[in-house]
Every structure is written in C-alpha cells, then in structure tokens.
C-alpha cells in the first residue's frame, strides 16, 4: 500500500487506463448495446402517416398537432467517448506522474494502458477503413466485369 501512496497520480493513471482498455475490449466483443436504427421503410411510413394526418386535420379545419420525438441515448457512443476520455486521462496522469518524479513502473503502466486503449481504437478504425476500401474495389470490379488482379 505504501507504493500506491507514494505514486498516487501514476497509479490513478493505471487505473483509468485499465478501465478504459477493459471497456473498449468488452464493448468490441459484446456490443453494440443500443437499439438498431429504424429502417428506411419505417421512416417513410411514419412521415407519410404524419402528412396524411396533417392533410385530414387541415381539411376538417382542426388544429394540427405535432409530436416531438425524444432522441434515444446512444449507449455505444457514450461507451466509446468515455473510454477515449479515460485513456487520455491516463496519459495525462502518466505525464503528471513523470513530472512529479514518481516510480517508473507506475508511469509506464499508465502509458501502456492509456496508449494501448487509444491504439486499440485506432486499429479498429483503420481496419474498418481498409475493409471499406476493399469492398468499394470489389463492387467496382464486379460492376465493370474486370478482375481484381
């Protein structure tokens, strides 16, 4: 317990970084947690029903009532943003711990956990970009009748 008491900032950075990394891995493995977005057909059906109700109310001379829908909380976006914020907080704690001349293992632990979390998110984003580019090439190749080679 004495080591943690001497290295409060870097130990806090390791805790932030470890929580952020676990959140990122669990969210990637078991997510998405929010409800899927509505389909295009349901959006069009809702809009046409609203137009029909508005036209009928206008013809009858009634007052048109509009219902404002609340936007749902996007749990996935909150998890991603909070994980990145915790990783940045871990890197800041590592920097402050280094300025305070705390123990190296605590500083390096905070750097590894915080940097690992940011690298994990960057790697996932990069894989998504590469896969989307390959998919576009595959679609163009299929449409033009050419080969990928």
UniProtKB/Swiss-Prot annotation:
Coiled-coil parts of chain: none
Superkingdom per UniProt: Bacteria
Periplasmic side: 32-77, 141-149
Compartments where found: Cell inner membrane
Alphabetical keyword list: Cell inner membrane, Cell membrane, Membrane, Transmembrane, Transmembrane helix
Cytoplasmic side: 1-8, 98-117
This protein's name: Inner membrane protein YidI
Spans through the membrane: 9-31, 78-97, 118-140
GO cellular component, one term: plasma membrane
InterPro entries for the chain: Uncharacterised_IM_YidI
Organism, scientific name: Escherichia coli (strain K12)
Main subcellular location of this protein, as a coarse class: membrane
Gene name, Swiss-Prot/TrEMBL: yidI
Bilayer disposition of the protein: Multi-pass membrane protein
């Amino acid at each position: 317990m004495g080591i943690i008491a001497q290295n409060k900032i870097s130990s806090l950075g390791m805790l932030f970084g470890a929580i952020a990394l676990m959140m990122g891995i669990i969210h990637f493995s078991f997510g998405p947690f929010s409800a899927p977005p509505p389909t295009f057909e349901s959006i069009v059906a809702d809009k046409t029903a609203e137009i029909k109700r508005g036209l009928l109310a206008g013809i009858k001379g009634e007052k048109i009532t509009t219902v404002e829908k609340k936007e749902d909380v996007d749990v996935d976006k909150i998890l991603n943003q909070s994980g990145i914020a915790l990783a940045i907080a871990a890197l800041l704690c590592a920097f402050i711990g280094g300025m305070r001349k705390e123990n190296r293992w605590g500083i390096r632990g905070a750097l590894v956990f915080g940097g690992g979390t940011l690298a994990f998110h960057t790697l996932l984003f990069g894989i998504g970009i590469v896969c989307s580019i390959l998919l576009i090439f595959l679609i163009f190749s299929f449409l033009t009748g050419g080969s990928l080679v």
